[in-house]
Every structure is written in structure tokens, then in C-alpha cells.
Amino acid sequence: MAAVAGSGAAAAPSSLLLVVGSEFGSPGLLTYVLEELERGIRSWDVDPGVCNLDEQLKVFVSRHSATFSSIVKGQRSLHHRGDNLETLVLLNPSDKSLYDELRNLLLDPASHKLLVLAGPCLEETGELLLQTGGFSPHHFLQVLKDREIRDILATTPPPVQPPILTITCPTFGDWAQLAPAVPGLQGALRLQLRLNPPAQLPNSEGLCEFLEYVAESLEPPSPFELLEPPTSGGFLRLGRPCCYIFPGGLGDAAFFAVNGFTVLVNGGSNPKSSFWKLVRHLDRVDAVLVTHPGADSLPGLNSLLRRKLAERSEVAAGGGSWDDRLRRLISPNLGVVFFNACEAASRLARGEDEAELALSLLAQLGITPLPLSRGPVPAKPTVLFEKMGVGRLDMYVLHPPSAGAERTLASVCALLVWHPAGPGEKVVRVLFPGCTPPACLLDGLVRLQHLRFLREPVVTPQDLEGPGRAESKESVGSRDSSKREGLLATHPRPGQERPGVARKEPARAEAPRKTEKEAKTPRELKKDPKPSVSRTQPREVRRAASSVPNLKKTNAQAAPKPRKAPSTSHSGFPPVANGPRSPPSLRCGEASPPSAACGSPASQLVATPSLELGPIPAGEEKALELPLAASSIPRPRTPSPESHRSPAEGSERLSLSPLRGGEAGPDASPTVTTPTVTTPSLPAEVGSPHSTEVDESLSVSFEQVLPPSAPTSEAGLSLPLRGPRARRSASPHDVDLCLVSPCEFEHRKAVPMAPAPASPGSSNDSSARSQERAGGLGAEETPPTSVSESLPTLSDSDPVPLAPGAADSDEDTEGFGVPRHDPLPDPLKVPPPLPDPSSICMVDPEMLPPKTARQTENVSRTRKPLARPNSRAAAPKATPVAAAKTKGLAGGDRASRPLSARSEPSEKGGRAPLSRKSSTPKTATRGPSGSASSRPGVSATPPKSPVYLDLAYLPSGSSAHLVDEEFFQRVRALCYVISGQDQRKEEGMRAVLDALLASKQHWDRDLQVTLIPTFDSVAMHTWYAETHARHQALGITVLGSNSMVSMQDDAFPACKVEF
């Protein structure tokens, strides 16, 4: 991905390399950059007899060639090679392009060389901002000490006179500390290094012409040029919980979405917003969260705000064709903005204060930012979104403390928690710490330890509702909440419905027994449909004894065929108001898949349905994907009165859920179906007629990184977190045109230290590979089944035999094709099971000997299928539960099925989901008879007990180096994201990675952990090479930083994680 080679020809006696960093978001930086370029050129004391610099600069202006990189979008190279001078000007380069050109310059035999580093740089450290990441003295020394360069120089005869390399760089920040290190490098490099010498040459006509030309090339682009409109129309619909992780340069940028609500977190340091190619396909971004103000987090967001203002001006001015204007005016509407307005913590030298700029732009747009701070104990979340039958999105603020001066200066640390309506779907927990110091972050988490959903690796609403159902006093509340979600409660009483009551997961009124049934059914059914079906029937008979209507419903669910019928022909049935009931079966797979989909051996994957990591034979995966693809796009739901008023009524939390005409979230946007571009290594599902919504069905968040699969990884082997199902492909409306092609971690060939254990992705040019995948029109050359055949993954809830039916019912779950406020459904519509008689209680397997515990688990699991026939009834991998659990990696927590806590709600902080160590409680101890499930407060949470998350960013900025072993002991996530390619992060990278390894080996849960870096680093490569052998034993997968997402006819760097 190197740009046009700028030097390296022995014929040229002199070489000039000018590097200008990232594009400018503001005109004020242009003057500063031109001054730096002039200072650098005039400081070059090249002998006029050898090179007439004034004349050569004039020749450059008239004869140079301009090249736009086809691999690094936005990078330009101005190059000219004459008899006396070879000149290369790199504009807006990536870090890899800069490294390549620096190597070329160092190896160039020219006797006189000049390197000028100019561009936007941080005031505090002097770090130069590039298109991707930054360039600091630390990075520069890494290049000078590169082993490859030294080896090449050692094999060439030494020159009579050592070449002279003049370096002009910022004179402040950490660059001032570079001078002492320079003398020690001269001998090994056979160079005379001169750092920031004073001006030697006078101003000249040639220099003026050169600077004028460069100024024209550096003219800040208009908002429409910086953030280009898409080439094709259509809105993107994200129906399942997911998180897009973008390369944020010096900072971070992420996009979290659930069905009906989207959140943009920070904007990254690049004015050419890394998230733009995704959000331009959305009609609305419901919330924007800025964790901290600064040059590392706001430039990308400010570019979006500038474009929105430019669109307003365009509309006011009129002119142009309607079609053209419509194509350009496509930025999404913005909802609430969370931003602790204050002076930027970091800013660019001679640049604008990004925080002040953001406030100004928001004011012009009529948006008032809302500050965030931690409230009093007990912590109460801010309800961002809540909709009956869909779910609730809460935001907990862990930092900063309540109002005060400290609040305005500190970074925000926010925990987003998605509570789905379906009792069997997975509760999703995602942490965005910003620059919060780990100590403050952990202090904030201590205040949340009473929350049951943080005590288990995988939690579902039914786990949380179990205890409450045993209490008769809560029957009214549970009935109300169930009604509000459109569920048919065990004892429905319309007159007592209170739509405003805070949503409680659908099976609140059911007995603990239901929890067990539902928790077990999905995974067991999936493993062995036949046994599970046969066992479920007796279970259903018991339910029938309690209620005739329920008997009918459950009978329909008990058999795979009956279950399939209602789902496929749901359109003929009355509107399904008890959405949560069918959702579990339909969406259970998508809820549980989360984070763990990173790689674990096939044998272990079978036992980790909760994390949906289990690979299956290619043929089997195809059977699942193709049928599902034909009927799986959720239909936009029409607004329902209940959904609109529920957040406000009866809820003690502050509700910020926007009320949009016709629908909440992207659901309301009309979507245009367009062809999908298939990238190599995507599962067979991509080839299906309706696989345009690949982003949902093929989320390639994680990649299985198994050393033996090197060939496959070359092709972009990817492993989706959830089973590759195209549940919603049936509808032509909600189209998610996104193909994800994650890249495995790889080593650069230039680094000889990475031999055999080198990262799975063995390609040298990661960006080149990414570009190949991005342009994936040649997918046919690489059979889509390559991924399926090598490492296909099935979510624990992916129904194989009844795939089509499952897809349909899932569609019902998502949209039901009817307004959520429709009347209660026909009693035959799969209502939640009745509570078990009070005399029945579950035996806690953890209190039994391992063998007995496994038997109990198997039995209860196999019965449970009836409760959720729609999604699991046909799953083939059910029986070998005990055996699967004993297989490492996913066995521990993954094996603790997402729906694992059958009778023990996650509130039992003490109940570890049955894992291969099922006989040993992981966090707290419960009573043997399961009575704890009827006593919510029985288990006390230890003072510093760990919290479990699905995805967590590691603190960045000044707090990056403070992340230690204790942090990983207390914050246990299935996915960790390392972002912020700044100097501090690079210097402290090894210590953080070692802390993860040291901490992971002491976890009492055998969890599969995926590490997702947003940038490439030498420290990461070195660590990977030295510790790779331990990764599989510890259950750690490291992804590459060059994952690509292909959407319609475009691609952009990002890693998508689906939960």
C-alpha cells in the first residue's frame, strides 16, 4: 500500500521527501503547514553545485505527476525525478505508506537527503496526525532501528562519504527529546543525521511557486467533498444488536445499534470521518456520545456537523436539479447529543479548539448538548430507548462523579445495556470508557455490582425475571409489564394493563421452571432435535394440565412442523402482541451470539451455543443460511401508542427515547434493495437471492484464528458471532447491504522475528488484502463456501432443520408485520408457559456431584425446548452437552449457555452457568434446593467481584498505560477493543497485553476472549509472535486491524461485532 516510490534510485544525487499529514478540517492549519514546509526546505544546506534547489523546485511544479492511491483512499503523491533531484510529496498518507517511504529514503544511496514532516499535530506531544493514526518520535525511532533496514545496509559496501540526512520536524513536545537519540543511530545507519538545523537558504522564486502549488493541493475540501454522498440510494436497517468498531486514528469511533435505536460514540481524529460511509445510509442517528473533548475524538464528528450545516445552506440557496440535491442532502438526522462541554483536553497546534467548534456547530444546528455525570447510589440508568415487544436500552454513567468542576474536565465512562423483549434473547452489555482512569472506572462499576446482569457471562431476561416470578406480590407488575410488551401473560388482565410501567422481560409471571425450560430449550434443541422434541412433549403435557389455551399453543410448538407452519404463514394470523414469546425462539440465536464468536476450536464450539461459536459442516451451514436468506428481513414496525408512551409512563428512569413519526429507530426508514457485493471468503448465504441484508446475517465481527487454517485466512476467513442466518431477507424493505470481511492478525514480512507462530493472516500487505476484499466483486473466484467449509459458525440458537420457519418467526419477532399496539393475539399464538406449581423447585446442579449435575442439566434442557419451539426445535446439536462442556475454550462461560441460568436468575451473582466446572460455583454460592431463585437477595456480591461484559473498549489517551492485571480481573469481557493509535498507547501496549494474559489465566470461568485492535503496531506483532502459543490454551483470539465492511458498491475499514 505504499505510495509512489519517492527515492531509492542511485542515479539521483539528492532526495527530497515532504510529508504532509492528514487533511485539514479547518483553514487555519494551512498557514501553519506552509510555514513548516518553508522552514524545512530552507534548512537544507545542499551544495548548489550538486543541486540547484531553486531550479529543481520550478521543474517539479511544471513536470511532476500526481497519483491517487487506489488502496489508501484520499492519499495523494506528487512525484518528480530529475537528473539532480528526486522529489516526493506525500499528502494525507496512512501510517504504513509513511513507513514505507521512510525506509526507501533511508536505503537511498543519494548523498544528500531531506525529510520534512509537517501537518496537523497535537500541541502537547507534537504527534503528527495522519490519515490513520499518528506519527511520533517513538514511531520514527522504530523505523530508524528497523532490523530489515540494518540488515540491508550491512550487506552493501559502505560509501566513501556517509550520506547526510536532514530532518525537519516539530520543535515542541516529544520531538525535543529526539536529539539525544540521534547520535547513537548514525553508525548503524551509516548516515549523518541533522535534526531541525537553522535556515540556510534564502527565499527564492522557485520555493514560492512550489509552496503556492502545494497550498492549492492542500486547500481544505468542502464538506461535500470530505464526506461524499453514496453512489446508490437506500437506507440501512440494523435489526439486531451490533457494534461497528472503526479505526479512530489517535482516538476511537464506534457505532452501537439495536433494533430501533442507534448510538454514535466519538468521531475519531480524522476529519474524513471513518464512520461516514455507514451513517450516510441511515435516516437518523438517535444519540451521539462524546466521551471526552479533544483532537482525538471530535474532528470526525465536527466534519459531520459541518456537512449538515452545508446541506442547510444548499437547501436555502436552491438551484441544481432535484435529483442531484436529493443525492447530496443525505446526512442523517441527529437526536440527543451527550457532551460534557469544556475546553478540549487536547488540541492541534495552531488549530481550532475542537470542543469550542463542536459547541458552535451544535448551536447552529439547534442542538443543545446534555452533560453526563454519575448519579447517587443506587445507580439508575438513563433509558435511551424503550419499545414494547422490542426491548429497552439503558445507559449507566460510571464517571465522572456528580456535578462540579471535575465533571467538566473528566472523561465520560458509559455502560450501555440492551434488555431485549424476548425472554431467551441475550442481554448485551457494552462499555465505552473514553479516557477514564481504570481506578475511577472500577470505582464506578462497584456501584453497579448489585445488577444481576453483570454477574454472569451470558444473561437473558428470563434469567433476570426468575426470582420475581416466584413472588406472588410481583404478579401484578409482571402481568402489566408483559402486557406492555405485547406478551400474553399467564393470567392476563387487560384492565390492569399499564403501558407506562417499566418494561420487565416477558416471562415475569412465569415460575422458575419456565426459566429453566426456556434457557435450556434453545441450545438443546439445536443440538439434537429429535431427542429434544420427544422430551419436550411431556413437558408440554404438564403445562397443558395447568391451562387449556396454553396447551394448544404449546402443542403447536412442541412439534417442529407445527412450529414452522405458524411462523411461515404468520401473515395470515392476527397481529402477534406477545412478541417476546416468539422472539425468544426466533431471535434467541441472535441474542446469544455475541461477543464470543471469536475463534474457538470446533469441538469446543459445539458446547458454546450461548456464544454461537460452534462451527458446523459446510453443507449444514448452507442448509441453514440459504433457506433463511429467503425469508428474513424484519419489516419496519408501525408506531404503537404503547411503545411511544411506555418510556415515559411508570418509569423512574429518565427516558430519552425519541418519538419518531411512524417508527422508532431506523425501522421507519424506507429501504431500497440493491445488489450485494460478495467478498471472498463469505459464507454461502451471500449468494442467496435475498442476502442483501448480509450485514445482519453475516456479521463478521470476529474471525476464527486457527494456525492450521492459514490458507483460508488468506482469503479473509471470517467467523460471524452469530450463526450466519439471513433471517430477514424475505422483506424487500429493511435491507442491510453490508458484507463484513474481518482480517486475522498478521505479521509484516519485513519483521523477520515472526516465523511459524506468526499471526494467522500471513499476508504482507494487510491493506492490500483489505482492498481486495473491499472490491469483492470477484467473489466468485473464491467460493463463498470457503468460510462455511472451513470455519462456519452456528449460533447456539440457529435452527437448522426448521431454518425457514425460524426465520419467519424471527421476522414476526422483529416486526410482526403489524403495529405493536394491535390487540392481543389469538390464544393459539404460542403464549409463555404457565408457572410451575409452587411445590416444584429446581435442583441446583452446582450443589450436586459433577456427574449428577450434568445429567440434571441435560434433562432440564431437553424438556425446555417446548417453551421455545420456534427457534430451537430443530437445532441438531443438543445431546452432547456434558461432553462439549469438558472441552476448553468455550466450555466455561460459553458452555454456560446464554440462557443457562434456568432457574437461577443472573441476579444470583453466585450462580455460574453450568460449565465444565459445573460443580464449582463461580461467584457466589446458592442454596441446594434452588430456593435462591425465589429469594432475590439471597446471594451477596463480594466486594470486588468481577463484572461480565460483552464488549469493552480499553481506556485510551493518558489512561491507556494505567490498564493493569487488576483491570482485566475485574472487567471480564468477551471482546476487548484497543483503540487510539497515539504514542502513549504504543509505548504501553506490551504491558497491557501481558496484563491480559496474566489475568486471563486466573479467571475462574473458561471464557473465549477476542482482542480487537483498531490499528497496527510493532508492539502487537512482537507480543503476538512471542505469546501465540499460549493464546489457544487461554482462549484468546487476536484479530487483525484491517477488517473491511463492504456495503453495496463501497467498502470501508471497520470490524462489526454482532451480539
UniProtKB/Swiss-Prot annotation:
Annotated segments matching region Disordered: 461-733, 751-942
Keyword DNA-binding: yes
Keyword DNA damage applies: no
Biased composition annotated in UniProt, kind: Polar residues: 547-557, 783-796
Subcellular location field: Nucleus; Cytoplasm, Cytosol; Cytoplasm, Cytoskeleton; Cytoplasm, Cytoskeleton, Spindle
Misc note: Depletion of MAP1S by RNAi causes mitotic abnormalities that consist of failure to form a stable metaphase plate, premature sister chromatid separation, lagging chromosomes, and multipolar spindles.
Gene: MAP1S
Annotated stretches, region: Necessary for interaction with RASSF1 isoform A and isoform C: 666-1059
Name of the protein: Microtubule-associated protein 1S
Domain notes per entry: The N-terminus of the heavy chain associates with the C-terminus of the light chain to form the heterodimer complex. Its C-terminal part of the heavy chain interacts with ESR1.
GO terms under biological process: apoptotic process; autophagy; axonogenesis; brain development; dendrite development; metaphase chromosome alignment; microtubule anchoring at centrosome; microtubule bundle formation
Biological source species: Homo sapiens
Comp. bias intervals (Pro residues): 825-836
Tissues where this protein is expressed: Expressed in neurons (at protein level). Expressed in spermatocytes, spermatids and spermatozoa. Expressed in the cerebral cortex. Highly expressed in testis. Moderately expressed in the brain, colon, heart, kidney, liver, lung, placenta, small intestine, spleen and stomach. Weakly expressed in muscle.
Oligomeric and partner information: Heterodimer of a heavy and a light chain. Interacts with microtubules and actin. Both MAP1S heavy and light chains interact with microtubules. MAP1S light chain interacts with actin. Interacts (via C-terminus) with GAN (via Kelch domains). Interacts with ESR1, LRPPRC, RASSF1 isoform A and isoform C, microtubules and VCY2. Interacts with WDR47 (via N-terminus of light chain).
